[in-house]
């Protein structure tokens, strides 16, 4: 083997909800049979697929042959970039500045408006002062739970 240069990614269609079980069985089978399955990925955002990294498609076939929850015999070949899109979290952090008015879109204060006091990008948190007339308070919440309000 040339150190992963020619390894490919194969998407296996499985029963939705059985991805982790299938991945575990494939890992045990690959270890027992000495198959060259380099990695097994259960994508968090896509149900019904397990992704295998292997040099030889025959190893993928041997690892999945006869498994109960595998729906299709022929796996889909994926490019590295496609796998990275599935695995890498895409978090869009809004650009917030102190003094800006935001709406809280999740959590205990959902639906309330607040004014930004401080933004901590490294921790992914924002400190806000709630603007509700009956409920004046300061809270530190995750930055992905707020959305800027156009004034």
Curated annotation (Swiss-Prot):
The keyword rRNA-binding does not apply. CDD domains: KOW_NusG, NGN_Arch. Belongs to the archaeal Spt5 family. Stimulates transcription elongation. The keyword Transcription regulation applies. Pfam families: KOW (PF00467), Spt5-NGN (PF03439). This is Transcription elongation factor Spt5.
């Amino acid at each position: 083997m040339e150190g992963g240069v020619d390894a490919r990614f194969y998407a296996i269609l499985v029963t939705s909800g059985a991805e982790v079980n299938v991945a575990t069985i494939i890992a045990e089978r690959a270890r027992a049979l000495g198959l060259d399955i380099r990695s097994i990925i259960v994508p968090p955002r896509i149900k019904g697929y397990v992704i295998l990294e292997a040099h030889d498609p025959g190893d993928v076939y041997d690892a999945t042959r006869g498994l109960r929850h595998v729906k299709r015999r022929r796996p889909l070949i994926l490019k590295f970039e496609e796998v990275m899109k599935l695995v890498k979290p895409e978090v869009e952090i809004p650009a917030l500045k102190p003094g800006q008015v935001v709406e809280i879109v999740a959590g205990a204060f959902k639906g309330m408006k607040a004014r930004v006091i401080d933004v901590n990008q490294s921790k992914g948190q924002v400190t806000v002062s709630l603007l509700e007339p009956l409920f004046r308070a300061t809270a530190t919440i995750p930055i992905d739970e707020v959305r800027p309000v156009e004034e």
